[in-house]
């Protein structure tokens, strides 16, 4: 534990700016009650009943009111951080909040009260076993949620839904490890612990449950991160019109002049709660215009980073030689949807096709101008993302969670291989189970480095 993890800390816990209510939060750390009671007396001029709202004046150093509001005192361990906590709820003007914050710092100087760092209150909650690491991350995810579905999923993670799944997996792995260790420790016994307890069957069940958890986590990661979708193609094929159609607003300038879009135009839209980060880019062509060439270079950079590329074509011409050249440069591994736009000029009905000669490629015929086929394109993007309609019960997950789950999955797969060669590989079987358990524990913080904690909590807002 870092030395600063026990310092008394204070911060404004509400967003910057003006509001009806502002909150200053103090967590007393090692100071405990000996620090809390004198500060309460100095600020409020009276004792506070624990866990009761008291309407009091907030006093300056001379005993004059700075403000009046609600004071709440939570003795340890029954508080957000698990420490003695004081919350002062006053009027939410920035000057009033700064005066109240400075008054706390001045009154608490004797016991080392300092400004909190970003995420430090939630870090204290984690260190004091009020939250595990997945729940602590869910606090930030709930604050940052950009869709209702993401907010609900973050709430489920904060309530411990994700953590309970991980703890159940860890318990099952530990039980299986005990069987393996027993067989290793008593090789001369007639009892075959692995056979008697159906160790292989237990491992198969753990792997199936892990696959289910990983599937839900992928859905949650989609809700949190969304999908980066790049519109690419030659000039004047309707990329900007498609962006406007997907967004339902006139975001990009649309003209019949080739090269109108010279830099990217980005917009995030929601489809079934999934954030789709749509990026309109400069038309891809050979040009002598230096500004346009810079825009085209940026287009290729965006394509390299994309989750999905929408390759737009003019449905009147179909796939031209120039389009073939563009398609050949698309990075391997990035899904591409071929979008044939302007069907309003050809009379071709909006549809989704899977050309037999094109492998996994999908073609969507649509009219961005009229809106025909836009819903089909949205559905195709969700399909590529792997979103399952009605997956409301998922919990929000982060990339580090997915990495740990995949690593645990690989260790369990290796354990299954060793189980088939029991006589030669029992030690390796046990080791793979241990490594899988370690990966799962890292998700909830049972086994986590201080460096990782620093990165996670530094991304929180101050006062949380």
Curated annotation (Swiss-Prot):
<dbReference type="GO" id="GO:0002098">
    <property type="term" value="P:tRNA wobble uridine modification"/>
</dbReference>
<feature type="binding site">
    <location>
        <position position="261"/>
    </location>
    <ligand>
        <name>Mg(2+)</name>
    </ligand>
</feature>
<keyword id="KW-0342">GTP-binding</keyword>
<dbReference type="GO" id="GO:0003924">
    <property type="term" value="F:GTPase activity"/>
</dbReference>
<keyword id="KW-0547">Nucleotide-binding</keyword>
<feature type="binding site">
    <location>
        <begin position="236"/>
        <end position="241"/>
    </location>
    <ligand>
        <name>GTP</name>
    </ligand>
</feature>
<dbReference type="InterPro" id="IPR031168">
    <property type="entry name" value="G_TrmE"/>
</dbReference>
<dbReference type="Pfam" id="PF10396">
    <property type="entry name" value="TrmE_N"/>
</dbReference>
<dbReference type="InterPro" id="IPR006073">
    <property type="entry name" value="GTP-bd"/>
</dbReference>
<keyword id="KW-0819">tRNA processing</keyword>
<dbReference type="Pfam" id="PF12631">
    <property type="entry name" value="MnmE_helical"/>
</dbReference>
<feature type="binding site">
    <location>
        <position position="257"/>
    </location>
    <ligand>
        <name>K(+)</name>
    </ligand>
</feature>
<feature type="binding site">
    <location>
        <position position="236"/>
    </location>
    <ligand>
        <name>K(+)</name>
    </ligand>
</feature>
<dbReference type="GO" id="GO:0005525">
    <property type="term" value="F:GTP binding"/>
</dbReference>
<feature type="binding site">
    <location>
        <position position="260"/>
    </location>
    <ligand>
        <name>K(+)</name>
    </ligand>
</feature>
<keyword id="KW-0479">Metal-binding</keyword>
<protein>
    <recommendedName>
        <fullName>tRNA modification GTPase MnmE</fullName>
        <ecNumber>3.6.-.-</ecNumber>
    </recommendedName>
</protein>
<comment type="function">
    <text>Exhibits a very high intrinsic GTPase hydrolysis rate. Involved in the addition of a carboxymethylaminomethyl (cmnm) group at the wobble position (U34) of certain tRNAs, forming tRNA-cmnm(5)s(2)U34.</text>
</comment>
<dbReference type="InterPro" id="IPR004520">
    <property type="entry name" value="GTPase_MnmE"/>
</dbReference>
<dbReference type="GO" id="GO:0005829">
    <property type="term" value="C:cytosol"/>
</dbReference>
<keyword id="KW-0963">Cytoplasm</keyword>
<feature type="domain" description="TrmE-type G">
    <location>
        <begin position="226"/>
        <end position="386"/>
    </location>
</feature>
<feature type="binding site">
    <location>
        <position position="25"/>
    </location>
    <ligand>
        <name>(6S)-5-formyl-5,6,7,8-tetrahydrofolate</name>
    </ligand>
</feature>
<dbReference type="Pfam" id="PF01926">
    <property type="entry name" value="MMR_HSR1"/>
</dbReference>
<dbReference type="InterPro" id="IPR025867">
    <property type="entry name" value="MnmE_helical"/>
</dbReference>
<keyword id="KW-0460">Magnesium</keyword>
<feature type="binding site">
    <location>
        <position position="255"/>
    </location>
    <ligand>
        <name>K(+)</name>
    </ligand>
</feature>
<feature type="binding site">
    <location>
        <begin position="280"/>
        <end position="283"/>
    </location>
    <ligand>
        <name>GTP</name>
    </ligand>
</feature>
<dbReference type="InterPro" id="IPR005225">
    <property type="entry name" value="Small_GTP-bd"/>
</dbReference>
<dbReference type="InterPro" id="IPR018948">
    <property type="entry name" value="GTP-bd_TrmE_N"/>
</dbReference>
<dbReference type="InterPro" id="IPR027417">
    <property type="entry name" value="P-loop_NTPase"/>
</dbReference>
<keyword id="KW-0630">Potassium</keyword>
<comment type="subunit">
    <text>Homodimer. Heterotetramer of two MnmE and two MnmG subunits.</text>
</comment>
<comment type="similarity">
    <text>Belongs to the TRAFAC class TrmE-Era-EngA-EngB-Septin-like GTPase superfamily. TrmE GTPase family.</text>
</comment>
<keyword id="KW-0378">Hydrolase</keyword>
<dbReference type="GO" id="GO:0046872">
    <property type="term" value="F:metal ion binding"/>
</dbReference>
<feature type="binding site">
    <location>
        <begin position="255"/>
        <end position="261"/>
    </location>
    <ligand>
        <name>GTP</name>
    </ligand>
</feature>
<dbReference type="InterPro" id="IPR027368">
    <property type="entry name" value="MnmE_dom2"/>
</dbReference>
<dbReference type="GO" id="GO:0030488">
    <property type="term" value="P:tRNA methylation"/>
</dbReference>
<feature type="binding site">
    <location>
        <position position="464"/>
    </location>
    <ligand>
        <name>(6S)-5-formyl-5,6,7,8-tetrahydrofolate</name>
    </ligand>
</feature>
<feature type="binding site">
    <location>
        <position position="87"/>
    </location>
    <ligand>
        <name>(6S)-5-formyl-5,6,7,8-tetrahydrofolate</name>
    </ligand>
</feature>
<dbReference type="InterPro" id="IPR027266">
    <property type="entry name" value="TrmE/GcvT_dom1"/>
</dbReference>
């Amino acid at each position: 534990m870092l030395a600063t993890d026990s310092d008394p800390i204070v911060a404004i816990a509400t967003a910057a700016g003006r509001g009806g209510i502002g909150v200053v939060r103090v967590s007393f750390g090692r100071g405990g009650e000996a620090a809390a009671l004198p500060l309460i007396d100095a600020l409020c001029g009276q004792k506070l009943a624990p866990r009761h709202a008291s309407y009091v004046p907030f006093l300056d150093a001379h005993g004059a009111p700075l403000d009046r509001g609600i004071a709440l005192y939570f003795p340890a361990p029954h508080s957000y951080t698990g420490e003695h906590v004081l919350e002062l709820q006053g009027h939410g003007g920035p000057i009033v909040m700064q005066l109240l914050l400075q008054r706390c710092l001045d009154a608490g100087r004797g016991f080392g009260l300092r400004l909190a760092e970003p995420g430090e209150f939630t870090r204290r909650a984690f260190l004091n076993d009020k939250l595990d690491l997945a729940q602590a991350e869910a606090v930030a995810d709930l604050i940052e949620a950009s869709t209702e579905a993401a907010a609900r999923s973050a709430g489920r993670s904060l309530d411990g839904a994700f953590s309970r799944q991980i703890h159940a997996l860890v318990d099952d792995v530990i039980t299986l490890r005990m069987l393996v260790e027993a067989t290793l420790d008593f090789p001369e016994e007639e009892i075959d612990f692995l056979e008697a307890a159906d160790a292989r069957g237990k491992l198969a069940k753990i792997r199936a449950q892990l696959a289910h958890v990983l599937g839900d986590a992928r859905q949650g990661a989609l809700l949190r991160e969304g999908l980066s979708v790049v519109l690419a193609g030659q000039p004047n094929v309707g990329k900007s019109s498609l962006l406007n159609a997907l967004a339902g607003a006139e975001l990009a300038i649309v003209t019949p002049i080739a090269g109108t879009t010279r830099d990217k135009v980005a917009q995030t839209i929601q489809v079934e709660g999934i954030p789709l980060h749509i990026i309109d880019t400069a038309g891809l062509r050979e040009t002598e215009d230096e500004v346009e060439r810079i825009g085209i270079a940026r287009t290729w950079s965006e394509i390299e980073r994309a989750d999905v590329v929408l390759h737009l074509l003019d449905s009147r011409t179909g796939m031209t030689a120039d389009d073939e050249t563009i398609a050949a440069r698309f990075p391997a591994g990035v899904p591409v949807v071929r979008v044939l736009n302007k069907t309003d000029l050809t009379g071709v009905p909006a549809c989704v096709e899977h050309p037999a000669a094109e492998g996994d490629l999908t073609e969507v015929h649509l009219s961005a101008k009229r809106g025909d086929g836009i819903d089909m394109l949205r559905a195709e993007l969700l399909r590529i993302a792997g979103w399952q309609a009605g997956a409301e019960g998922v919990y929000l997950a982060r990339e580090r969670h997915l990495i740990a789950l995949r690593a645990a999955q690989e260790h369990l797969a290796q354990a299954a291989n060793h189980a088939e060669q029991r006589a030669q590989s029992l030690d390796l079987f046990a080791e793979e189970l241990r490594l899988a358990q370690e990966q799962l524990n890292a998700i909830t913080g049972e086994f986590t480095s201080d460096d990782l904690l620093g990165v996670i909590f530094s991304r929180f807002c101050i006062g949380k």
